[in-house]
């Protein structure tokens, strides 16, 4: 496989997010279609990846999206904007296929409480922490994947499209503010990033109850 490829057209940030969610769908190695997927077409294979049948060894391919993911992000750089405005990390926790990426401007001076170090841990559950909230929804989806994941996908696409639209307006406001007061622009973008991240986790917590 190549380390990188040059696309023949501009790639949208939402498309790159979807690249992160691949399980080889639509190929001969589609993990939702082989016997290991079971009746609910689950595209995940629990470790170990290799197994033996009748003395012959086999191995599952590793998909891009996996269940043991801590976090992923898509980095977006817009050269036509001031550096403080032009850089965004679209950040998500847990399995990329089920996460929702939200925009964290690169100039942000703090992170949302739901994503902050010390708010829960790998051994300490709290429904105020983004990872645990997303992990609950994702683990539930694994049990009946072809019935539950489409619901996640619909919600995911709606939120990410909404955030992309928000960013267009925030960019304009931040650029205008940046020209007058750099510190105020950075605080404006930090507030937007933190409020968006915290609100997302509140939304996803409610979604788990759905």
Across the structure, where does each feature detected by a protein language model lie?
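C-terminus-biased signal that marks the final domain/tail of proteins
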Residues: 1-210
